[in-house]
UniProtKB/Swiss-Prot annotation:
GO terms for cellular component: cytosolic large ribosomal subunit. This is Large ribosomal subunit protein uL6. GO terms for biological process: cytoplasmic translation. One of its GO terms (molecular function) is rRNA binding. Belongs to the universal ribosomal protein uL6 family. Part of the 50S ribosomal subunit. This protein binds to the 23S rRNA, and is important in its secondary structure. It is located near the subunit interface in the base of the L7/L12 stalk, and near the tRNA binding site of the peptidyltransferase center. It holds the Pfam family Ribosomal_L6. Keywords: Ribonucleoprotein, Ribosomal protein, RNA-binding, rRNA-binding. InterPro entries: Ribosomal_uL6-like, Ribosomal_uL6-like_a/b-dom_sf, Ribosomal_uL6_a/b-dom, Ribosomal_uL6_bac-type, Ribosomal_uL6_CS. Signal peptide: none annotated.
Amino acid sequence: MSRVAKMPVAIPEGVEIAIKDTQINVKGALGALALAQNAHVVIASNDGKLTFVPANDSRQANAMSGTMRQLVNNMVVGVTKGFQKKLNLVGVGFKAQAQGDKLNLTVGYSHPVVMAMPAGITVATPTPTEVVIKGSDRQRVGQIAAEVRAVRPPEPYKGKGIRYSDEKITIKETKKK
């Protein structure tokens, strides 16, 4: 059995989990999330904890039990605390502006880049060079953050561009004559 799947998922107060034959629904203070259930994993609920057991002894069932456990745990954390990604804009004249569900980026192009945020994702700009993306779905928060970063990824010679706040950019040395 997978090491990750051996750990049960604790269900905190205010979180409702409904396990149907094809879907797992998690509802909490920050919203509701759904996940398709895998046929290789048996999910049992007892005493406020969820346990994940492989349905058979195959390698795929063993691997999927750990994967399903972690996905459900991310859903529980998402509907209670939520997830966030911080991005920094580095460069002269680079700035961001949040306008409702849109993010307006001025990052050195001849035109501003306007990105619409999907439902369930909120964007904030505490400073003009900082963007905070929040939501209850970890995968969507990471995907939107990656799409914002892809507008102007950091370049290796000066480090200008949009980067994650915890990202380290190694600066290359320029060509010498």
